[in-house]
């Protein structure tokens, strides 16, 4: 599907937001997987194929035994792999999203690393939200608090504020408010096994087949798994 949405154009049709799992020069890396394989292993492997893009932190969110579980770490991808091999060795699942971050808003840190999560969702992002300060002020007035200095956390909580049980509707409403370039991969807590993704300006590809689906910022991330 064509995932591109341009601000000022007619509202994006519902079938133009990519839903996986149900029958500028920004160099962050996004991956997502849903299928029969171990999602933790697939996410780490696909993220390793995006290391050439440069990054300062990495993280993943996976549908585990306790809902969406998120692990992230400053520094090299190996730091994340070590956390997953030891402190979070029990994390397992078949659907998740991953991210390597190149800082644009907020210094490199565990808190600023992606994914950014709320009780309702977890989100990874490549791009720059130009009006995030205005959106953050509006969300703060609604009672939201922020733990990072990133525009990504603002995007996550904006979608959270608009969510009424329909992921596609919430994403469309958020896109009407967001200014800038972005690609999102999103898990919704009440939609286990599914990934929702959309983009405006920033690169994002989607592939599906043989009972599994992928999203990625670039082809090399998933080339060994699929060519569809």
PLM segments and residue spans:
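Conserved short alpha-helical segments that host acidic/polar catalytic motifs at enzyme active sites
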Residues: 18-228
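Extreme N-terminal basic, low-complexity initiation segments
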Residues: 2-9
């Amino acid at each position: 599907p064509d995932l591109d949405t341009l601000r000022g154009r007619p509202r994006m049709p519902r079938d133009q937001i990519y839903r996986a799992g149900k029958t500028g020069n920004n160099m962050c890396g996004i991956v997502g997987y849903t299928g029969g394989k171990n999602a933790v292993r697939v996410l780490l492997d696909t993220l390793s194929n995006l290391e050439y893009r440069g990054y300062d932190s990495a993280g993943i969110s996976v549908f585990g035994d306790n809902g969406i579980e998120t692990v992230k770490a400053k520094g090299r991808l190996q730091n994340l792999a070590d956390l997953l091999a030891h402190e979070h060795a029990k994390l397992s699942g078949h659907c998740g999203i991953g991210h390597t971050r190149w800082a644009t808003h907020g210094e490199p840190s565990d808190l600023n690393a992606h994914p950014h999560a709320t009780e309702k969702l977890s989100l990874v992002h490549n791009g720059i939200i130009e009006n995030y300060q205005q959106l953050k002020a509006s969300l703060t007035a609604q009672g939201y608090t922020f733990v990072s200095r990133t525009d990504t956390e603002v995007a996550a909580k904006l979608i959270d504020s608009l969510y009424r049980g329909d992921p596609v509707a919430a994403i469309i409403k958020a896109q009407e408010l967001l200014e800038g370039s972005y690609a999102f991969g999103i898990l919704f807590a009440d939609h286990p096994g599914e990934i929702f993704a959309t983009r405006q300006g920033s690169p994002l590809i989607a592939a599906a087949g043989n009972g599994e689906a992928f999203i990625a910022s670039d082809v090399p991330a998933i080339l060994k798994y699929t060519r569809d």
